[in-house]
């Protein structure tokens, strides 16, 4: 308000100086006053910019508001919504997937570490074909039967893209950052980032919604906060492949669209005849940008 008041005074003084100039009246004192006003405005604008930046940074650190249906609490308050199928009794002690993959010669961590360091893997032969087949199966299911539009997005994104999805500034430590002489880019942690921002800064007609996108991409995460967590096998890798579903919808339809998206994901597990459970995460176990998560 103070800055606007000084700017208003400056505009009025400019008109007064012009008027006095036409009347051949002395404007020395008024010009001297306006010089002081201009200096005050510059000083206040710098202070205002600093305060606005600090306020913006604080607001960017605020998480999304949990939906009323979300249980309050930490991970112990997570709620099992439903269970589908039962695990088959194997009659023997199963191996960890990492050990099994290594024994079959389709998964190799040691050679990946030689190439890239820890938390990378190479898939060999049938392992590579299996992953490729699963990816194609999911893409075909979602595009041909569930109405999603397949997108191949960029794997490198601008900082403002990650700002728009809530990854920056809070989770910068979890991202891989690249730098060139002309710009700063980040490797995507999930296809959700570029898909969500496809229509950023656009006004969409309600009749176009919902928009349903599916994308297969590699994902890159530093997993800086995973110390002490299970990192065996293919868990918490720096690079992994994922088929992502994203919907853009009006806020009043978002919960229905979420339930539909959960159903779409469940269909994959049903057709693969894998037993599973759907868990509603508690507020303390949800992601920073989520209002409701299964």
Model-predicted regions and their roles:
Residues 83-294:
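TRNA-recognition modules of translation machinery and tRNA-sensing kinases, especially anticodon-binding
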Residues 1-88:
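N-terminal alpha-helical targeting/anchoring segments
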